[in-house]
UniProtKB/Swiss-Prot annotation:
Residues reported to bind chlorophyll b 1: Y51
Known role: Required for non-photochemical quenching (NPQ), a mechanism that converts and dissipates the harmful excess absorbed light energy into heat and protect the photosynthetic apparatus from photo-oxidative damage. NPQ includes dissipating excess light energy to heat (qE) and the reversible coupling of LHCII to photosystems (state transitions or qT), which are considered separate NPQ mechanisms. Is responsible for most of the excess light energy to heat dissipation (qE), also known as energy-dependent chlorophyll fluorescence quenching activity of chlorophyll excited states.
Keyword match Cell membrane: no
Binding-site positions, chlorophyll a 1: F66, E87, R202
Species assigned in the record: Chlamydomonas reinhardtii (Chlamydomonas smithii)
Name of the molecule in the record: Light-harvesting complex stress-related protein 3.2, chloroplastic
Ranges annotated as spanning the membrane: 93-113, 137-157, 203-223
Induction, per UniProt: Induced by sulfur deprivation. Induced by high light stress (at protein level).
Source organism superkingdom: Eukaryota
Topology term for the membrane: Multi-pass membrane protein
GO CC, alphabetical: chloroplast thylakoid membrane; photosystem I; photosystem II
Phenotypic effect of disruption: Impaired in non-photochemical quenching (NPQ) under high light conditions.
Length: 259
């Protein structure tokens, strides 16, 4: 009988989870103990990699997870979701910026720019200071409204554990804005379309950086630079033909020599 009681007591002790205690002193000086709060176990690295590998945007030639800087080694799924939201947003802004560069340089006299005292001219990197204030004010308000809507739809209340994190039921990038009804209902088709958007956004981020660098170095507009490159290549090809025929070579204009 006594053995059975001892056995049950020992079994109960084994099933009770251990809790760490911290010895503290009360105001009266007596020594007491308080239980330490239990912390959640960190998400395993394998879970983060598996989650990332199944996201839209994994594409050739990088069929696996492309993470040369090793960000995922110390990241959580919450971090990955926030980074994906940032990538989608920056890609969309870059696509608009790349389009705005080339269109803005072709519509330099368009009255929407509120530049009544003179014309907007030159590379797009110098248009900011030439365009009237009446254009930037409504644009700033529109950006503020759009960003406020994005925060309201996707971001958690910044208190407690919700600081700097997305809502649990929010799909990064999905703001519910689909006026043309192009969003596929099939999950696989949706993933393909999301991958296309990500790839176009990634290309646009590289393109807008190249646009800015090219205009800073050569001080020419995008299409003007492209036309000059074609002109130079045409002259060089013509020179090769003239050499083969024993004809005088067409000289390369000075403005094309530096291209």
């Amino acid at each position: 009988m006594l053995a059975n009681v001892v056995s049950r007591k020992a079994s109960g002790l084994r099933q009770t989870p251990a809790r760490a205690t911290v010895a503290v002193k009360s105001v009266s000086g007596r020594r007491t103990t308080a239980a330490e709060p239990q912390t959640a176990a960190p998400v395993a690295a394998e879970d983060v990699f598996a989650y990332t590998k199944n996201l839209p945007g994994v594409t050739a030639p990088f069929e696996g997870v492309f993470d040369p800087a090793g960000f995922l080694a110390t990241a959580s799924i919450k971090d990955v979701r926030r980074w994906r939201e940032s990538e989608i947003t920056h890609g969309r802004v870059a696509m608009l910026a790349a389009l705005g560069f080339v269109v803005g340089e072709q519509l330099q006299d368009f009255p929407l720019f509120f530049n009544w005292d003179g014309r907007v001219s030159g590379p797009a990197i110098y248009h900011f200071q030439q365009i009237g204030q009446g254009f930037w004010e409504p644009l700033l308000i529109a950006i503020g409204v759009a960003e406020s809507y994005r925060v309201a739809v996707g971001w958690a209340t910044p208190t407690g554990t919700g600081f700097n994190s997305l809502k649990d039921d929010y799909e990064p990038g999905d703001l519910g804005f689909d006026p043309l009804g192009l969003k596929p209902t099939d999950p696989e088709e949706l993933k393909v379309m999301q991958t296309k958007e990500l790839n176009n956004g990634r290309l646009a981020m590289i393109a807008i950086a190249a646009f800015v660098a090219q205009e800073l170095v050569e001080q020419t507009e995008i299409f003007e630079h492209l036309a000059l490159r074609f002109e130079k290549e045409a002259i060089l090809e013509l020179d090769d033909i003239e050499r083969d025929l024993g004809l005088p070579v067409t000289p390369l204009p000075d403005n094309l020599k530096s291209l």
